[in-house]
Design a protein with these regions (language model features):
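RNA-binding accessory domains that recognize and position tRNA/RNA substrates
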Residues: 1-178, 182-208
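Conserved small/polar residues in nucleotide/adenosyl-binding loops
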Residues: 212-219
Length: 221
């Protein structure tokens, strides 16, 4: 494992080791306090462009499930069809994993998806810094390489457009009630929960200029 340093925009540094795809990266540093579910968190579109810090101390011990899909097109075990987080930052990465449904290790998955991962970080201390300072940018740099990547600048980046569906998608067609879902980065499990409640879900892109409800006969409201 190569030595890496997480450098926050206020100059604070945390030193660790690389276990994912080896490339420097910059982005907004955010924390996640979930005790499990790192495959779901990494594939959550709401984390697009962010360096995700996991506060739970041990990560990777149950591997990564396969990318399979349900008949309705939703991923079975993930929240979308790929990793959206720009990097993952953990305290202790377990190279050994064991789970009946595991297909590969977290490191193998990260490398395949070109996503950096670093371990050996005091993530709880890092979380305290982020909690007190608020939104903060950061970089993951390799100690044996010069810092040649710019600070993350999200001005002009439309993340909603990047994660939203491009076409209208229907789930559970013909159900008794219908829900229109404007996709600004929806997780698969939100759609699944709606389907399980017996409704048809019409998933539409985010980029409507206006949603207009026309007049109707009588008191249809």
């Amino acid at each position: 494992m190569r030595n890496v340093t997480l450098v926050l925009s206020d100059g604070t540094k945390f030193h660790g080791k690389s276990f994912g795809y080896e490339k420097p990266v910059a982005g907004e540093v955010v924390f996640n306090t979930a005790m499990m579910g790192y495959p779901e968190s990494l594939t959550d579109p709401s984390y697009a462009g962010q360096l995700m810090v996991l506060t739970f101390p041990l990560v990777g011990n149950y591997g990564v499930p396969p990318f399979s899909f349900e008949p309705n097109g939703l991923p079975t075990f993930m929240e979308s069809d790929r990793i959206y987080a720009s990097a993952i930052i953990v305290a202790d990465y377990s190279e050994q994993y064991s789970h009946w449904n595991a297909k590969e290790s977290l490191a193998e998955w990260l490398k395949r998806e070109h996503v950096p991962g670093i371990t050996g970080i005091d993530t709880r201390e890092l979380t305290k810094v982020l909690r007190e300072a608020g939104v903060m940018m950061g970089k993951i740099l390799f100690d044996d390489e010069p810092d040649n990547i710019p600070e993350a600048n999200y001005e002009g980046v439309n993340f909603v457009d990047l994660v939203s569906c491009k076409d209208i998608i229907k789930y559970n067609e013909g159900a008794g009630k219908r829900v229109v879902l404007v996709d600004c980065g929806v997780k698969a499990n939100i759609i699944r929960c709606l389907i399980n409640r017996g409704v048809e879900v019409v998933r539409v892109p985010w980029n409507y200029c206006l949603l207009y409800t026309s007049p109707s006969p009588r008191d249809s409201a």
